[in-house]
Amino acid sequence: MNKLLYLAGRILKPKGLKGELKVLPETDFPESFLQRKLLLVGATEQSAVERRVAGATLQNGFVLLRFYGIDSREDAESIVGERIYITEDDLIPLPPDTAYIHDLVGLRVLDEDCREIGVIRDVLKLPAHEVYEIAAGDKIVLVPAIEEFVVETDLEKGEMTIRRFDEFL
């Protein structure tokens, strides 16, 4: 598989006896699973193979997914722990002033005086809001992804400007 893949979910466990799977969606749009006909499934991006979707439903924040060819609990157990990927073509267009996590990871982080202070390593999803994990020298700093601290995000320049960064050190 040569296309760039994006993590959409993780297979947690079988559900029932007929091959249904409980999936933790790794997306803000779990309902997108309901329209998908094909998904890529594998332990890694490199090992991912296409699987045809036989059905999907949402239940309590999880996706219940069925694939053609996965017809028993034993079949389902054989892919527990694997990841579900989609291609860039399958990404849902975002509203203005929003970005995918993969677009934010790697952005240079600047303070309001345009001094570089680090690089975004990850975006953590916490109950109250997302948090940027920033590698700042030899430290990892967590900054809430809220307007109070984030001045501007410029994906074209590959930069994010943060105010009051010294409060997080």
Curated annotation (Swiss-Prot):
One of its GO terms (biological process) is rRNA processing. One of its GO terms (cellular component) is ribosome. One of its GO terms (molecular function) is ribosome binding. Keywords: Chaperone, Cytoplasm, Ribosome biogenesis, rRNA processing. InterPro entries: PRC_barrel-like_sf, PRC_RimM, RimM, RimM_N, RimM_N_sf, Transl_B-barrel_sf. It is found in: Cytoplasm. Residues 95-168 form the PRC barrel domain. Gene3D superfamilies: PRC-barrel domain, RimM. An accessory protein needed during the final step in the assembly of 30S ribosomal subunit, possibly for assembly of the head region. Essential for efficient processing of 16S rRNA. May be needed both before and after RbfA during the maturation of 16S rRNA. It has affinity for free ribosomal 30S subunits but not for 70S ribosomes. The PRC barrel domain binds ribosomal protein uS19. Binds ribosomal protein uS19. Belongs to the RimM family. This is Ribosome maturation factor RimM. It comes from Prosthecochloris aestuarii (strain DSM 271 / SK 413). The gene is rimM.
